[in-house]
Regions:
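ATP-binding N-terminal substructure of ATP-dependent carboxylate-amine bond-forming enzymes
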Residues: 1-79, 83, 95-103
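Active-site nucleotide/adenylate-binding loops and adjacent lid/helix of ATP-dependent enzymes
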Residues: 15-18, 30, 70-159
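Phosphate-binding site of ATP-dependent enzymes
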Residues: 131-196
Length: 196
């Protein structure tokens, strides 16, 4: 949020940066033109904030509350993409209370390496890249700490890119180059070696 705040200020906009942990939504000044949500994870990316802002009649930028809720749940997102005929990595959602044998059997069916993650979480929280069967139990337990459903997918090495789209206008592709193996929480928020 700080980078967006600074960029908007440099372009002459008056910006009030709000931490929802310190200021309730109903305390937002009535003179506010628009909210640009920059929150991650539960409450920020899952449609909750968007629904609350709609309820209060406060205009905001971003995807609808419904779209945010659907895409925050990675298992639901996989189902939507598959039904649309789009290619997705081999994988499956599972209840972390499944038997160890069931988890290992399903995991072996897609091969290694794998990405094990909470089905509904943001910012790469709770994600582990698993290179062998001996690490699957620990990875599932870590993901389950963050959500009641776990997603296991085949790890596909490649370039990480993001493509901003605003009001139907497609902006240039941005490649993300983390210093570590993948774009984890640290690379996103703490490691100044990440390049864009």
């Amino acid at each position: 949020g700080a980078c967006v705040t600074n960029a908007l200020r440099q372009r002459g906009h008056r910006v009030l940066q709000i931490d929802p942990a310190l200021l309730a939504l109903h305390e937002i000044p009535h003179s506010t033109d628009v909210i640009y949500p920059m929150l991650h994870g539960t409450g920020g990316e899952d449609g909750t904030l968007q629904r609350d802002l709609d309820r209060l009649g406060i205009p905001w930028l971003g995807s609808s509350a419904e779209a945010s809720a659907l895409t925050f749940d990675k298992v639901v997102t996989r189902e939507i993409l598959a039904k649309a005929g789009l290619p997705i990595a081999p994988g499956f959602g599972l209840n972390p209370d499944s038997t160890r044998e069931a988890i290992h059997t399903a995991s072996l069916s897609i091969g290694y390496p794998q990405v094990v993650k909470p089905a509904a979480q943001g910012s790469s929280v709770g994600i582990t890249i698993v290179d062998s069967e001996q690490d699957i139990d620990t990875a599932v337990a870590e993901a389950a700490r963050w959500d009641g459903m776990v997603l296991i997918e085949k790890y596909i090495a490649g370039r990480e890119v993001t493509v901003p789209v605003v009001n139907g206008e497609v902006f240039p592709v941005v490649e993300i180059l983390p210093a570590a193996r993948w774009y984890d929480y640290s690379a996103k928020y703490a490691d100044d070696r990440t390049q864009y």
